């Protein structure tokens, strides 16, 4: 039975069938359901979204309401996806913050790099996770071929080895659902991935990501720059949410994250400002060497090797009550994102270091790729659970995701050392790259199109 808003209630212990079942109602799972609902080739196919929780209400994002501590830097390509799905106006009508510049700097040297908007309108938009989820969820009610079941906790999945059988999902309440294609969007600890028996490479960084909402003060009253400073324990980033509020993502050791969460608010703010401004870890010999090498760089400009205006991060004034939380960081990637009657998307397929909140953009790219592949399969009369077509998704998604994931992993490792030789090498490389305007603009455009 279908209720208003797309929610369905199945009779207990009954077995039902859907052409596609998506497990996971987060930012990626909801986007996948919306994409299939909007796909003209998929209108004859039934889609079920299983959400273990409850969708957030958009009423909680009214002006003046506290910001949520989980935010994402949404790339221009992802914004285009939201526009195609018809949810961008809904998201943007509540509260988003445009980022016109990204500034990255080092705690061990004077090296820095700046990305500004060029041909694009913005570097990114900073948006609260739940605002995206809620907007996508509301959109789902418009699609006649999509049903949503909230509070649906998966107990077990069964994925066949051949197309003769269907994939099955058993819920904790006893409901059993069969499907031609099971899409796992159920996060890092994916039950769908576990049931698929797909090989998965994973390791932990021995880091936790500490998030919080902070009130800030800028020199000009505007907060349009995303700031990231690399420290030996991990990067600390401030992502604008309004002219006076930023989201904090602070990667550090598990022990340090726990200590920081328990500090009184004023002490926490003092330590955060120290992490952003302190010069205690600067290596004078490295900075002197960088200065000398910069003078010999044939590509240097008048501002090369010199601090530019507007390169000081905002001063943190207070931290929002009860906004501090932390979670473990790690790397993971399924060797294949597909098997017979099963496809993985988002964190169920891959996991990367947050580094200023970019990871979910890869998940939305997965959605775009898989949506196209499934549309092609339906138009050609194929079985949507066939590896023949799903392999196209796997190939394109792996080719897209792995270079980004490996680059971020290497960058995180490179900046977790204070060895003078490595600090000098990375500092000169960063400053040299910052002076190459055309190359930097090309990279910015490339990353925006591939994240």
Curated annotation (Swiss-Prot):
Gene3D superfamilies: FAD/NAD(P)-binding domain. GO terms for biological process: ubiquinone biosynthetic process. SUPFAM superfamilies: FAD/NAD(P)-binding domain. GO terms for cellular component: extrinsic component of mitochondrial inner membrane; mitochondrion. Its main location: mitochondrion. It is an enzyme of class 1 (oxidoreductase). It is a peripheral membrane protein. It is found in: Mitochondrion inner membrane. It catalyses: a 4-hydroxy-3-(all-trans-polyprenyl)benzoate + 2 reduced [2Fe-2S]-[ferredoxin] + O2 + 2 H(+) = a 3,4-dihydroxy-5-(all-trans-polyprenyl)benzoate + 2 oxidized [2Fe-2S]-[ferredoxin] + H2O; a 2-methoxy-6-(all-trans-polyprenyl)phenol + 2 reduced [2Fe-2S]-[ferredoxin] + O2 + 2 H(+) = a 2-methoxy-6-(all-trans-polyprenyl)benzene-1,4-diol + 2 oxidized [2Fe-2S]-[ferredoxin] + H2O. The keyword Transferase does not apply. One of its GO terms (molecular function) is FAD binding. Pathway: Cofactor biosynthesis; ubiquinone biosynthesis. Its EC number is 1.14.15.45, 1.14.15.46. Its cofactor is FAD. Keywords: FAD, Flavoprotein, Membrane, Mitochondrion, Mitochondrion inner membrane, Monooxygenase, Oxidoreductase, Ubiquinone biosynthesis. Component of a multi-subunit COQ enzyme complex. HAMAP family: COQ6_monooxygenase. NCBIfam families: COQ6 (TIGR01989), Ubi-OHases (TIGR01988). Belongs to the UbiH/COQ6 family. FAD-dependent monooxygenase required for two non-consecutive steps during ubiquinone biosynthesis. Required for the C5-ring hydroxylation during ubiquinone biosynthesis by catalyzing the hydroxylation of 4-hydroxy-3-(all-trans-polyprenyl)benzoic acid to 3,4-dihydroxy-5-(all-trans-polyprenyl)benzoic acid. Also acts downstream of coq4, for the C1-hydroxylation during ubiquinone biosynthesis by catalyzing the hydroxylation of 2-methoxy-6-(all-trans-polyprenyl)phenol to 2-methoxy-6-(all-trans-polyprenyl)benzene-1,4-diol. This protein may be expected to contain an N-terminal transit peptide but none has been predicted. This is Ubiquinone biosynthesis monooxygenase COQ6, mitochondrial. It comes from Caenorhabditis elegans. The gene is coq-6.
């Amino acid at each position: 039975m279908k209720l208003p808003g797309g929610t369905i209630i199945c009779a207990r212990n009954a077995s039902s069938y859907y052409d596609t079942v998506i497990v996971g109602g987060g930012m990626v799972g909801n986007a996948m359901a919306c994409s299939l609902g909007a796909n003209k080739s998929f209108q004859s196919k039934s889609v079920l979204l299983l959400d273990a929780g409850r969708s957030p209400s958009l009423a909680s994002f009214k002006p003046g309401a506290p910001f949520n501590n989980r935010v994402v830097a949404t790339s221009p390509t992802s914004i285009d996806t939201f526009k195609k799905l018809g949810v961008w106006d809904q998201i943007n009508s509540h509260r988003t913050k445009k980022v016109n510049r990204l500034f990255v700097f080092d705690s061990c040297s004077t090296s820095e790099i700046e990305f500004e908007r060029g041909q694009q309108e913005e570097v990114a938009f900073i948006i609260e996770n739940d605002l995206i989820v809620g907007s996508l969820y509301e959109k789902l009610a418009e699609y006649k071929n999509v049903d949503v079941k909230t509070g649906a906790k998966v107990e077990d999945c069964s994925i066949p080895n051949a197309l003769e059988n269907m994939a099955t999902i058993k819920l904790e309440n006893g409901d059993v659902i069969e499907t031609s294609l099971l899409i796992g969007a159920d996060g890092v600890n994916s039950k769908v991935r576990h049931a698929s028996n797909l090989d998965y490479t994973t390791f932990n960084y021995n880091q936790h990501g500490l998030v919080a909402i902070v009130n800030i003060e800028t020199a000009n009253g505007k907060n349009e720059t995303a700031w990231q400073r690399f420290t030996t324990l991990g990067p600390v980033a401030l992502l604008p949410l309004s002219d006076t509020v930023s989201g904090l993502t602070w990667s550090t050791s598990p022990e340090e994250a726990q200590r920081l969460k328990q500090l009184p608010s004023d002490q926490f703010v003092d330590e955060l400002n120290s992490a952003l401004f302190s010069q205690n870890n600067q290596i004078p010999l490295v900075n002197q060497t960088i200065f000398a090498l910069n003078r010999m760089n044939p590509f240097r400009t008048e501002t090369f090797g010199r601090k530019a205006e507007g390169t000081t991060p905002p001063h943190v004034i207070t931290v929002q009550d009860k906004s501090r939380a932390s979670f473990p960081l790690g790397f993971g990637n399924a060797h294949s994102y597909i098997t017979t009657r099963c496809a993985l998307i988002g964190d169920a397929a891959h996991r990367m270091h947050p580094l200023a909140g970019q990871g979910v953009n890869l998940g939305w790219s997965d959605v775009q790729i898989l949506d196209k592949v499934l549309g092609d399969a339906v138009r050609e009369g194929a079985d949507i659970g066939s590896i023949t077509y799903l392999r196209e998704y796997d190939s394109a998604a792996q080719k897209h995701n792995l270079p980004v994931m490996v680059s971020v992993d290497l960058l995180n490792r490179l900046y977790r050392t204070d060895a003078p030789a490595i600090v000098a090498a990375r500092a000169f490389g960063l400053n040299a790259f910052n002076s190459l305007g055309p190359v930097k603009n090309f990279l910015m455009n490339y990353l925006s199109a591939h994240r």
